[in-house]
Each structure stands twice: as C-alpha cells, then as structure tokens.
C-alpha cells in the first residue's frame, strides 16, 4: 500500500523536476525511485518479520533499576529483546540505534498483577424463559460442579484482538498476570507480555496461578446458593483433588488388585497446576474475608496469595506473620454515584473509604510482600493515580514502584527475567520525561520484549464531531500495482477522539492518534521504513455515509474513499443524525 503511494506520486513527476531533484540522468533517477519504492513496499512486511531494529542504546538517561540504586547519565543497551548492559560507560554496539536519553528516566515495565487483559471475552449469558439468565455449563465430576473449569488456560486463550493490550501498554504496563473469568475455579492464569505477532509470543509463564472466587458463575440464585454454600463447595473441591491425587499415586505404584480410580478432568487440571507450583489466589478484601482466607490457606496446604487486600490496614501484622503475599485492588472504595442521598453510609463504610489507600503503607511497615492490580479499573492510567493515593497515605514512592514491578515478578516467580532493569533480563522498559508518579509526567517510549513503541498524546478535535466513525471501514485506493483495499476498525470517543487498527495486504498497524472534528477527520499510523519510524497520515471529510480524503507519507499523497461494508446509506444517515443529536 505505502510503496504504491510513493509510486503514484513519483511517477507523476515531470522529467525536468526529476533531473533537478537527483542531479543525474533520467535513467539513474528512475533506478533510485524504483529502489525506494521497492523498499517502502516491503516495509510493512519487514515490520511483521522483525524489520524493526533489534539493537538499541538509550544513552545519557536516568535509570531506575528498582533492584539497585538510581543511575544518572547511564546507558541501557538492548539486543534482540534482552537487556545486555546497564552502566554509565556501557559500550555501544555499531549496529545499535542510539536514542538520546538526556532529560529522560527509564523504569522497568509495569506489571498488572491480576487481570483478564488479553483474554477471549466471556460468552454473554443467553436469556431463558421470562428473561431469566441461562446458567453456564456445569463441570461433570462426582457431582455437578458449577463454574469449575480449571482446565482452561490463559496461555491457550490469548486474544491478540483485545484492544486493551495496546491501551495497557501505552500506559506503561508491559506485563500482566491474566486469567480466564467466570465461576469459582475459572482457569489457570499466565504471565503475559503485551506484544507479539502470534498468541504464543505473549506467554512468559503459562501455569502461574489458580484464581478462586466465592461468587458462583450464575450468582447466588444458583447452586451453591449462598456464601456459606460457596465456601463449603470450594473446600470440597480441594478435598476431592487431594483424594484423587493420593488415589492416583497408589494406583500408579501398584495397579494390580486395586480398582482403577476414575479420571476427573477438574481434579486432574488442578492437581497438574499445583505440581507446576501454581499459586492459589484467594479472595480477601475486608477483615472477615482475610481471616477466612487464613483458614482456607491452612486447610489446603498450598502456596496461597490473597487478593483484594483493601482492609489490610487492620490486619497487616497478621498477614506479615503468615508470610502471605497480597495483591491489592487499586479500585479504591467510593460512594456509589446513584446512591440514595437519604441513605447515609455507616461509619465503618466511611472509614473504609478513607483508610483503604493506607493499606499498602501498613503492609510495607509490617514487612509483608504486596503488589498492585487493576481490579475494576478500565483505564490503566487511573492505576497510577490510585497508586499516588497510596503514596499520599504514607507509602514510600520506592515501595510503590516496587509493587508495580519487582514485587509481582517475585510473587509469580518470574523475577529472574522481569521486574527490574538488569543485564540478562527481558527488555521491558518505559521511558518518561519525569517522575513516574508526577501527574504531569508523560510516557515517551515503551519497550516490550525489546520492541519499541512510541507513545504520543492523542490529537484533540476542535469542534464537536458530526456523526460517529465507530466500526469497520473499507478503504479503497489505486496504486501503480492496481486497486488495493485496507480495513480500518475505528473506535470513537464522545469527544471525537479516534483509536483503532488498520489491516492491509501489506501488513497491520495501530492508530496512534486521530479525531473527527465537525465533518473533518485525521488519524495517523506509524510504520518502520528503512528502520526508522514513519508516520502515515489519513485526512479527509465525512458526509455521513462515506469518508473521502488522502493518505500522506513522507510528503507524498494518494486519494482514497471509505465505506462501511454491508451497511446501507440510509442506516448511515440515521446514525449520523443520532450523532448530531448527541
């Protein structure tokens, strides 16, 4: 596509212009143009095959390794996805692309310690008679088991189409501990890096943790029907796993004369995960839940981690004494927006809202290990704001940074490759123009597995948008090679800000900024051309059914039109009227 753009423009140049531009013979000029067009036409394909530089030197920056003291005026060398050196006088390889780090600060990539980012969306429940929700399928075992699917693996259910991958990455989160959702034993979590061309590229550690929930998949309207029933059910599942494991071991040792134990898929999956040293994540947000989690951890005799942890300020010393790590939910409690103003909250509820952000400081003071996770936060930038609240409540900034980097890596046993800036570790880095927890600081670059992503402030529209560009659009244009098409999947915010992806026969790219202002739009993608990031800018107008405009790259243009496949003009007109009414 992009090579065709240059061909179209270059081929239209007059002979005299070409002679003056190149200062050589017309034949030599055409050879140069042909070579340039060939290189640019291959650029998207090369990017997909690793055309991005493999060696980088970020020179003269402030480096915050987390595992050691801060380094001033230091250089970080990245080679083929791995940190090769971190030092003030690190030698720079000849093949490295040098990035000027003056005035910049390098941090380890951040880790969201418990989420479902990068997972396939859970199927929506279908309605039954009278609007009742259909119940999810049951796991078959000694009895029907609701929401017990431990054979599901996050490593097998990676969804590269999840747009949150880019959103989290742009906010500085290079790694997540992600799990399938739904039910009391939804599946096995995995450690994922947030970049890759294929699903398996994201997986850092496949069998990491077994999340447990005390909320049935169908709510308490279905079995087990109550909190006490859910607790009893979960305990029984672990008893079944223990019995099944022991019975299987006895049979394998001497199968003669012994009845063969029945294979049970759920038990086998849980036993296998435990053999792989997977942690068991137990819900524990308030004091009652935390002490209940103590009891469950004692009964199960497994390596347990508490998650929730927002009332840890009341029992921090007990948690530390038991050496139980805590994953702290950063969605701090707050008043419900639609709460009845006459329904005054209890004093305990008000105290909880006020003191929850102090839980990390209480745990740090007690000597407990903890990490942060997003919980119900949908905008990852809000996670740093939530961490800032915990800093304001007494947590040291260094401890806050550690809870976003090295601590989760240690909890999930990947600190040998993630969580700090050290030679030999995966090159997951974020580069900022200031202190990470300063609200004015901007993230400039992110590296995931050594791949560079430039982070830009989104363009803002000047006028309210006339219509909504959300949806898939077919872009049509003509190059000297013939007609070509690209599919652009757009999402538009209420203020007209655009995001999305472009897919073409020559490669794929993410939209790094864009907007619809009145009836005028613009969006930008960035691709590597000859090893350098290059902007490709789409601009034009929207008449309610069609987009028309031009694609510009390195000062050269080609015209395009875009329509929504399979959508009638009347439907688009109605949507536009609705957008105008907004």
Regions found by a protein language model. Give the residues of each.
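Bacterial N-terminal signal peptides
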Residues: 29-45
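Extracellular/periplasmic ectodomains of large secreted or surface enzymes and adhesion receptors
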Residues: 49-53, 361-365, 431, 437, ...
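Histidine-rich, glycine-flanked metal-binding segment
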Residues: 50, 54, 63, 67-109, ...
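Acidic, glycine-enriched loop/beta-strand segments at the rims
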Residues: 50, 55, 63-75, 88, ...
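His/Asp/Glu-enriched, well-ordered alpha-helical/loop segment
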Residues: 122-123, 130-143, 151, 279, ...
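Polyanionic/metal-chelating signatures
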Residues: 161-311, 442, 448, 455-456
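Central antiparallel beta-sheet cores of small beta-barrel/beta-sandwich binding domains
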Residues: 467-543, 548-565
């Amino acid at each position: 596509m992009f090579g065709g753009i240059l061909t179209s423009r270059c081929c239209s140049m007059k002979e005299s212009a070409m002679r003056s531009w190149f200062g050589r013979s017309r034949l030599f000029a055409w050879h140069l143009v042909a070579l340039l067009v060939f290189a640019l036409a291959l650029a998207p394909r090369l990017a997909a095959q690793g055309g991005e530089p493999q060696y980088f030197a970020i020179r003269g920056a402030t480096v915050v390794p987390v595992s050691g003291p801060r380094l001033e005026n230091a250089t970080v060398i990245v080679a083929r996805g791995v940190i090769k050196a971190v030092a003030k006088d690190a030698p720079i390889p000849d093949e490295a692309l040098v990035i000027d780090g003056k005035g910049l600060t390098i941090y380890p990539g951040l880790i969201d310690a418990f989420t479902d980012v990068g997972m396939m969306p859970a199927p929506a429940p279908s309605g039954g008679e009278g609007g009742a929700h259909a119940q999810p399928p049951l796991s078959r075992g000694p009895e029907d088991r609701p929401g017990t699917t431990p054979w599901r693996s996050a490593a097998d259910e990676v969804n590269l189409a999840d747009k949150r991958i880019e959103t989290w990455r742009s906010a500085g989160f290079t790694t997540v501990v992600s799990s399938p959702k739904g039910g009391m034993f939804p599946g096995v979590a995995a450690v994922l890096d947030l970049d890759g061309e294929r699903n398996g590229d994201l997986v850092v550690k496949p069998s990491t943790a077994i999340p447990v929930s005390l909320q049935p998949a169908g709510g308490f309207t279905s079995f087990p029907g109550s909190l006490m029933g859910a607790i009893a059910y979960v305990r029984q599942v672990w008893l079944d796993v223990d019995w099944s494991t022991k019975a299987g071991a006895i049979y394998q040792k001497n199968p003669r004369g012994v009845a063969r134990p029945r294979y049970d898929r759920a038990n086998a999956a849980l036993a296998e995960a435990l053999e792989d040293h997977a942690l068991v994540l137990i819900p524990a947000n308030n004091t009652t839940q935390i002490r209940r989690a103590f009891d469950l951890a004692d009964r199960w005799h497994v390596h347990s981690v508490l998650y929730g942890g927002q009332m840890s300020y009341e029992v921090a010393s007990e948690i530390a004494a038991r050496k139980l790590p805590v994953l702290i939910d950063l969605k701090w409690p707050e008043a419900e927006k639609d709460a009845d103003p006459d329904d005054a909250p209890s004093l305990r509820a008000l105290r909880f809202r006020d003191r929850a952000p102090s839980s990390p400081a209480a745990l740090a003071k007690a000597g407990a290990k903890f990490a942060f996770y997003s919980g119900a936060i949908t905008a990852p930038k809000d996670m740093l704001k939530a961490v800032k609240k915990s800093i304001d409540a007494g947590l040291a900034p260094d401890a806050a940074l550690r809870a976003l980097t090295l601590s989760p890596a240690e909890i999930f046993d990947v600190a040998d490759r993630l969580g700090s800036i050290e030679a030999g570790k995966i090159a997951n880095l974020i580069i900022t123009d200031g202190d990470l927890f300063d609200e004015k600081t901007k993230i400039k670059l992110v590296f995931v597995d050594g791949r560079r992503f430039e982070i830009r402030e989104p363009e803002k529209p000047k006028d309210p948008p006339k219509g909504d560009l959300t949806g898939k659009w077919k872009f049509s244009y003509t190059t000297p090679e013939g007609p070509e098409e690209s599919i652009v999947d757009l999402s538009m915010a209420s203020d007209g800000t655009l995001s999305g992806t472009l897919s073409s026969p020559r490669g794929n790219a993410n939209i790094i900024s864009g907007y619809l202002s009145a009836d005028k739009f613009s969006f930008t993608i960035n691709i590597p051309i000859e090893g350098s990031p290059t902007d490709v800018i789409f601009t034009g107008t929207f008449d309610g059914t069609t987009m028309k405009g031009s694609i510009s790259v390195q000062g050269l243009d080609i015209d395009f039109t875009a329509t929504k496949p399979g959508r009638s003009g009347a439907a688009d007109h109605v949507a536009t009227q609705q957008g105008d009414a907004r």
